[in-house]
């Protein structure tokens, strides 16, 4: 690549796109990389402010911005994704299928830390739809040393930085406890709220049982749903420290391994996560009945995508785990649950 006066560029090959920007009207290339400059092009180039041009001068070990952008694309792209053609050194990656987006954050930071190149993504651990933008790559200068390309590959490791976990059909059992609901003193509000959340995904509610605050009965109901083929069991009610609340003990008595009782999320601090073998058993706090967004909205898509969550996964929600209860909710396009 060499720099020359625009008036001297006739017959030369452009090594980058020439962009015209008219605010509110257009932002696009008037000439593409690889275009051979003609005499008639000179006034056009000058009209967009190009007094000098970079023209192609191929050197060993040097990559053009579009070549390097393709390399960054290949570090990111995975199954169920598609990428745009390079344009001005930029490439966009989009989802081709619905699922849960996973990002290797540590390796992403390592690649970006090399300088002169960038990969920007949306937040991971959230569901995406086919067609959604996932990431974009760009090289900062017009050319980059091939050696830096090799360092980027090494920093990224052997696996793509992005992954979409599919969400297959899941059968869900709901166990609701509380003497006030069981004895008909109040109407159950958990069931409708949970069904509305589940309806956003490929799920089937096998049934809902309403029980008194009896640990043995709650445990038996959990185990019955599991025997019937439930992929997940949701337990509602009885999650506080009140002496009549027996749900956490019932989940443990059913044989489930408690991952965490409590999460650094508001609303949702009294959330319980357990696994009965491979079956997730979730204890949902009362806020799920009335709050627009809670810890349940953060955990549900990850569980449905087959992730086996750990206490560390829940602990990481502390930063970003406070819902601001905005007058108009824009979740997930907000800070809630962003790690």
Please provide the spans of the model-predicted regions.
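Short, low-complexity N-terminal leaders and the immediately following helix N-cap/first helix
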Residues: 1-88
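Solvent-exposed alpha-helices and their adjacent loops that cap or buttress functional pockets
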Residues: 7-11, 29, 83-86, 126-128, ...
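C-terminal terminal segments
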Residues: 29, 85, 100-118, 126-129, ...
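Residue-level recognition of short, solvent-exposed, well-ordered loop/turn junctions
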Residues: 32, 38, 43, 123, ...
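Flexible, glycine/charged-enriched surface loops at secondary-structure junctions
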Residues: 55-56, 81-86, 144-146, 204-208, ...
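Extended, charged alpha/beta regions that create polyanion-binding interfaces
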Residues: 59-167
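Glycine-rich phosphate/diphosphate-binding loop of Rossmann-like nucleotide-binding domains
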Residues: 158-213, 217
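Short glycine/threonine-rich loop/turn motifs
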Residues: 179, 206-337
